[in-house]
């Protein structure tokens, strides 16, 4: 029996005991209860194309029997669909699921005969199903291509449903928007994100697929009310759990400094619990909504709002706040700093390095930073997140690391992570920390040059080792005694050591004798060489004669003067 087999399945798998999951499983596995196959590929919604007729089992209960007791007995077998009532009290009719009940035998285990029912009370009647009887996921599964990924998920922000459709779903975008608006409770507008969030203010361009062009929303999260214009600010409903988790970390006397506060999902719940908060956001619309939400939740006395660049907020407000709290002897809490800007937050961590290097202050309280980032890759996401923080800080995270937590999966091989660590004295006061990441073309060339030098050193080392090995092998060969290989009957015998009584040659004596012969030969040649005769004196040149005549004339003049 199908029903008995299904009961065994639900007994072994407790998660199928939930009412919605059980009937959804049975509805989608029953061919009679899925939309007609003719709607596949529809791009313009035609609600009439979903109409179909099926035959379903029904119990006709006599009026004299206990109708409520019988309904309780068959509760797990009821046909549950959208806009359909399986139990009609006025007509005493109960519609059962066609997959669970095929014959009267499927109902015997319930004991309906003991309650006055017989096989004649079970009938099969025709009923009409249409567009209104299926949920949005059942409609879209029947319409969209089978061989491609369907619509996986969406987020609901107030009355707006936010989609992020992939390219192959764009031809069906208007149909998808209409179906979701019809089926999702409280939805008045459906929008699709056109581009990724890459601008300064973290908002994105959107396309209205269906509904009202009204982006002013109001919602409740972690016990607080938030009102804002969804088209001008950043909001992610999937981070609701993470917002609450960080707020729960705060203890009595702690304070929160929110660098990228947005409309206040971290700051306002913390302030509502009695903690002091400094909240900042660069987006003027986010700042305006932040101030409004503080007043809406009546926490404006415990929160101070700023409209600054995140780097300026760190260098100015956070710096002065850390100094003031370390000078305040009555402060005993922890300074928490949240940095929820996954795409850029890690790059701003370098601004904490040496933040207090010029301040003469005794540090007693070390702030705890909660920075968010995207870990991209197939490796361990915690190691990737830690590496991003260490790379941008320029120092390794040692004992000051508190926690690395997974937040959510953004895309395949892309996870959002939170790294919580303390700003130690080494980070805040040290002025010799060098960032490990290249900051200019020069540093890149220096790093490349160092790599080339190391490569040359390694190559030279390998050559030296090779030369030494060759020298050792040559020395071994010199020591070996030459032997003659003799073969006998084709077999090569092992070489034997050659022994001989050769007279030892004295090389030194031979060299001395050769030198003596060269000396004798040299003396003999020099002795027989004829002596050179002196050359006759050359006659005086004309120049010399003129000089002599000049001297004689001068001597004659001297005598005449005397």
Curated annotation (Swiss-Prot):
Disordered: region residues: 523-562
Alphabetical keyword list: Cytoplasm, Methyltransferase, Mitochondrion, Nucleus, S-adenosyl-L-methionine, Transferase, Transit peptide, tRNA processing
Enzyme kind, highest EC tier: transferase
Location, primary (coarse class): mitochondrion
GO biological process: mitochondrial tRNA methylation; tRNA N1-guanine methylation
Keyword Nucleus: yes
Transit peptide: 1-41
Cellular compartments annotated: Mitochondrion matrix; Nucleus; Cytoplasm
Entry GO terms, CC: mitochondrial matrix; nucleus
GO MF annotation list: tRNA (guanine(37)-N1)-methyltransferase activity
Regions of compositional bias (Basic and acidic residues) in chain numbering: 523-534
Enzyme Commission numbers on file: 2.1.1.228
Residues holding S-adenosyl-L-methionine: 243, 281-282, 340
Matching InterPro entries: MeTrfase_TRM5/TYW2, SAM-dependent_MTases_sf, TRM5-TYW2-like_MTfase, TRM5/TYW2-like_N, tRNA_Gua_MeTrfase_euk
Self-association state and partner proteins as the record states: Monomer.
Protein purpose: Specifically methylates the N1 position of guanosine-37 in various cytoplasmic and mitochondrial tRNAs. Methylation is not dependent on the nature of the nucleoside 5' of the target nucleoside. This is the first step in the biosynthesis of wybutosine (yW), a modified base adjacent to the anticodon of tRNAs and required for accurate decoding.
HAMAP family from the UniProt entry: TRM5
Family the entry assigns: Belongs to the class I-like SAM-binding methyltransferase superfamily. TRM5/TYW2 family.
Protein name: tRNA (guanine(37)-N(1))-methyltransferase
């Amino acid at each position: 029996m199908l029903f008995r087999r299904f009961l065994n399945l639900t007994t072994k798998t407790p998660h199928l005991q939930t009412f919605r999951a059980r009937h959804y499983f049975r509805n989608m596995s029953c061919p009679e209860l899925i939309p007609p196959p003719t709607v596949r590929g529809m791009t313009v919604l035609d609600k009439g194309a979903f109409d179909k007729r099926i035959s379903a089992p029904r119990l006709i209960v006599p009026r004299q029997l206990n109708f409520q007791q019988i309904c309780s007995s068959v509760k797990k077998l009821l046909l549950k669909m959208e806009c359909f009532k399986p139990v009609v009290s006025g007509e005493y009719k109960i519609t059962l699921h066609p997959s669970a009940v095929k014959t009267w035998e499927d109902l015997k285990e319930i004991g309906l005969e003991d309650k006055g029912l017989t096989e004649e009370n079970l009938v099969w009647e025709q009923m009409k199903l249409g567009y209104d009887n299926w949920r949005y996921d059942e409609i879209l599964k029947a319409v969209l291509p089978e061989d491609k990924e369907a619509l996986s998920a969406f987020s609901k922000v107030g009355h707006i449903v936010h989609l992020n459709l992939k390219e192959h779903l764009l031809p069906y975008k208007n149909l998808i928007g209409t179906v979701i608006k019809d089926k999702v409770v409280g939805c008045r507008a459906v929008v699709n994100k056109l581009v990724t969030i890459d601008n300064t203010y973290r908002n994105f361009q959107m396309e209205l697929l269906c509904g009202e062009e009204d982006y002013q929303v109001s919602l409740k999260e972690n016990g607080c009310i938030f009102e804002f214009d969804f088209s001008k600010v950043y909001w992610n409903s999937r981070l609701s759990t993470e917002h609450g988790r960080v707020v729960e970390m705060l203890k009595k006397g702690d304070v929160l400094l929110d660098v990228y506060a947005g409309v206040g999902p971290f700051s306002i719940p913390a302030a509502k619990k009695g903690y002091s908060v400094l909240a900042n956001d660069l987006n003027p619309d986010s700042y305006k909504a932040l101030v409004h939400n503080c007043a809406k939740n009546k926490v404006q006395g415990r929160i101070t709002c700023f409209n600054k660049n995140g780097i300026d907020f760190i260098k100015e407000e956070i710096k002065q706040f850390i100094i003031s709290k370390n000078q305040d002897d009555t402060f005993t809490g922890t300074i928490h700093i949240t940095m929820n800007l996954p795409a850029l937050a890690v790059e701003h961590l370098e601004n904490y390095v040496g933040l207090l290097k010029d301040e003469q202050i005794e540090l007693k309280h070390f702030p705890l930073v909660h920075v968010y980032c995207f870990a991209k890759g197939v490796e361990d996401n915690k190691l990737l997140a830690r590496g991003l923080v260490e790379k941008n800080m320029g120092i390794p995270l040692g004992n000051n690391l508190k926690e690395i937590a997974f937040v959510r999966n953004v895309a395949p091989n892309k996870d959002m992570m939170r790294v919580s660590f303390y700003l130690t004295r080494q980070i805040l006061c040290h002025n010799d920390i060098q960032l490990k990441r290249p900051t200019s073309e020069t540093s890149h060339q220096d790093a490349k040059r160092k790599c080339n030098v190391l490569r040359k050193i390694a190559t030279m080392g390998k050559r030296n080792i090779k030369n030494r090995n060759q020298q050792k092998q040559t020395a071994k060969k010199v020591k070996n005694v030459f032997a003659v290989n003799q073969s006998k009957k084709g077999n090569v015998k092992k070489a034997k050591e050659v022994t001989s009584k050769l007279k030892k040659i004295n090389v030194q004596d031979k060299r001395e004798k050769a030198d003596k012969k060269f000396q004798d030969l040299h003396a003999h040649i020099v002795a027989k060489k004829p002596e050179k005769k002196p050359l006759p004196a050359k006659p005086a040149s004309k120049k010399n004669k003129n000089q002599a005549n000049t001297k004689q004339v001068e001597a004659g003049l001297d005598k005449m003067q005397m």
